[in-house]
From Swiss-Prot:
Function (record text): May play a role in DNA repair. It seems to be involved in an RecBC-independent recombinational process of DNA repair. It may act with RecF and RecO.
Protein name: Recombination protein RecR
Xref: SMART domains: TOPRIM (SM00493)
Gene Ontology biological process terms, A to Z: double-strand break repair; recombinational repair
Amino acid sequence: MNQQYPSVLLEKAVGEFSKLPGIGRKTAMRLVLHLLRQDTATVEAFGNSIITLKREVKYCKVCHNISDTETCQICANPQRDASTVCVVENIRDVMAVEATQQYRGLYHVLGGVISPMDGVGPSDLQIESLVQRVSEGGIKEVILALSTTMEGDTTNFYIYRKLEKMGVKLSVIARGISVGDELEYADEITLGRSIVNRTLFTGTV
């Protein structure tokens, strides 16, 4: 046991919390001590919610968004514009775009971006399923709404090359978002305008 901790159990709990992104050991300690001050029922409810989430959450068979059912609420909504698909990096980006209330189409969640430095290639992402969706017909426009980073631009270009001869309009969100920014950190007004003012993708990185 590390002499810094009075309990092995405390040390293990802090260690697990500190594995979460953005959580250092000091913050992990505060969270663990907070839980220790709660009653048993509250802590059990917290733990069970995470276990249940991991065991039972589904990914939409159409767009790969998180869902409680086989098809997510967005894809199942007949009032959404099924002819337009917005391609995003992750589920947080879906939530960010939805918060703008400026988009009524569907989504396609890639699960990341192409990043050779991190060992992420096209086959690790949901790119082929996007190609399959487009090939099935009905989609008129694909909006590329990835982060304005080198990896995001590389992924945009790769998708463009896969779809350029499939008869769909390929557009990209306007560069109201600063280069290097991730979509989820853009404010709602800026992101909303970037979607509304999207431009034709020309295939340049």
